[in-house]
From Swiss-Prot:
Active site: 120 (charge relay system), 150 (charge relay system), 226 (charge relay system)
A GO CC term assigned to this protein in UniProt: periplasmic space
Keywords linked to the UniProt accession: Hydrolase, Periplasm, Protease, Repeat, Serine protease, Signal
GO molecular function annotations of the record: serine-type endopeptidase activity
Protein name per the record: Probable periplasmic serine protease do/HhoA-like
EC number assigned by the record: 3.4.21.-
GO BP, one annotated term: protein quality control for misfolded or incompletely synthesized proteins
Annotated signal sequence range: 1-29
Species of the source: Haemophilus influenzae (strain ATCC 51907 / DSM 11121 / KW20 / Rd)
Localization per record: Periplasm
């Protein structure tokens, strides 16, 4: 039997798509007559649509232009050939290509001109232009971003006469609540579609190191909708439209949005600190299933199973143990490990939280203060392009200290430079390092890193990265 291949698509729109003419007919969810006494969403939309904008971006994308010849040279020898050899016989290894793209965004502060969107909409942009529903255009600058949560905040230059959107409490959402998606699909202009909340706490299973705790909706969402608004029937923001799953790249009734509470927490951190300071609970685990529930004598069928509690972590200090099952955070139900992972990461370091967990069939409540996730600070504090797209954590095992690469995003600079998941970085520019903090210190004095000392299996070699 032939399997259908489903693809997770970010939904920003490259302008090259516009050169292809097509018309797609898709089934559209409709709101039943009992929603309210009103027979139209128009009054609500008239207030909300001016707060949803279109972002046009221009920039230069980095692409790998190395000759395949260099790929045949063992990693341990490449360092000794030097830059001149690579330029003469293999190309410079990196080139830039102009790109343009379209996406959507939401005005969240009218007086200051703040617009919330997805990171993948503005990633790599040198120029950002924001167009309002009334046709006015503003130049914009990037205020801050968080790649792992796919959130970015931009600010309009000289904002005036803007409309902002109000945040809803996304923790109060229920499956079956009505949703309205607003954005600019395929560059056609602002478009409104409707549906319901299909699922909450959804993860796509992506292996990219991102934090996923999506609202799933069947409202029609297509390319160009990225960064646009998902609102409730009161016109309040419940999510930022981010991705779709589709066999064809178009709407298939499965769309994902970042919850408004999660986005709001990230924006507050960006405005306060200039970066996202992730919280760290200090647990490892997975999803609760029927077999685990039976083995650990609990009746719950949903929750986050704790398989390991890290030493000296917030979780250990609060008394959590391996085998505990977390069922709620701050009074809100936890359905999966991915959900609590995302909520902890976006809550912020130093924040106090409460957890409800099951142990030996009994429910317990505990409060704790989250620690800082130092591994999440690398992209904000350093300028080492070769590590773009790599998820890092401190490594201390088997008598070796360094930085472990736990995940590599496909087609990222880290992947292009030859880094692989499982690599251990133990040195930079011939200086030994034992953790991410030491790497940051080296880069403060030597920002132009040229070589990383890598342990890969039984191999110890230098990898040329500049």
């Amino acid at each position: 039997m032939k399997k259908t291949r489903f693809v997770l698509n970010s939904i920003a729109l490259g302008l090259s798509v516009l050169s292809t003419s097509f018309v797609a007919h898709v089934a559209q969810a409709t709101l039943p007559s009992f929603v309210s006494e009103q027979n139209s969403l128009a009054p609500m939309l008239e207030k909300v649509q001016p707060a949803v904008v279109t972002l046009s971006v221009e920039g230069k994308a980095k692409v790998d232009s190395r000759s395949p010849f260099l790929d045949d040279i063992p990693e341990e020898f490449k360092f000794f050939f030097g830059d001149r050899f690579a330029e003469q016989f293999g190309g410079r290894g990196e080139s830039k290509r102009n790109f343009r793209g379209l996406g959507s965004g939401v005005i969240i502060n009218a007086s200051k001109g703040y617009v919330l969107t997805n990171n993948h909409v503005i990633d790599g942009a040198d120029k950002i232009t924001v167009q309002l529903q009334d046709g006015r255009e503003f130049k914009a600058k990037l205020v801050g971003k968080d790649e792992q949560s796919d959130i970015a905040l931009v600010q309009l230059e000289k904002p005036s006469n803007l409309t902002e959107i109000k945040f809803a409490d996304s923790d109060k959402l229920r499956v079956g609540d009505f949703t309205v998606a607003i954005g600019n699909p395929f560059g056609l202009g602002q478009t409104v579609t409707s549906g319901i909340v299909s699922a909450l706490g959804r993860s796509t299973g992506s292996d990219s190191g991102t934090y996923e705790n999506y609202i799933q909706t069947d409202a029609a969402v297509n390319r160009g909708n990225s960064g646009g608004a998902l609102v409730n029937l009161n016109g309040e923001l419940i999510g930022i439209n981010t991705a779709i799953i589709s066999p064809s790249g178009g709407n298939a009734g499965i769309a994902f949005a970042i919850p408004s509470n999660q986005a709001s927490n990230l924006v507050q951190q960006i405005l306060e600190f200039g970066q996202v300071r992730r919280g760290l609970l200090g647990i490892k685990g997975g999803e609760l299933n029927a077999d685990l529930a039976k083995a650990f004598n609990v009746s719950a069928q949903q929750g986050a199973f704790v398989s390991e509690v890290l030493p000296k972590s917030a979780a250990e200090k609060a008394g959590l143990k391996a085998g505990d099952i977390i069922t709620a955070m701050n009074g809100q139900k936890i359905s999966s490990f991915a959900e609590i992972r995302a909520k902890i990461a976006t809550t912020g370091a130093g924040k106090e939280i409460s957890l409800t967990y099951l142990r030996d069939g009994k429910s317990h409540d505990v409060k704790m203060k989250l620690q800082a996730d130092d591994s999440s600070q690398l992209s904000s504090k350093t300028e080492l392009p070769a590590l773009d797209g790599a998820t890092l954590k401190d490594y201390d095992a088997k008598g070796v200290k360094g930085i472990e690469i736990t995940k590599i995003q496909p087609n990222s600079l880290a992947a292009q430079r030859g880094l692989k998941s499982g690599d251990i970085i133990i040195g930079i520019n011939r200086q030994m390092i034992e953790n991410i903090r030491e790497l940051n210190k080296v880069l403060e004095t030597e920002p132009s890193a040229v070589a990383l000392n890598i342990l890969r299996g039984d191999s110890n070699f230098y990898l040329l990265v500049q």
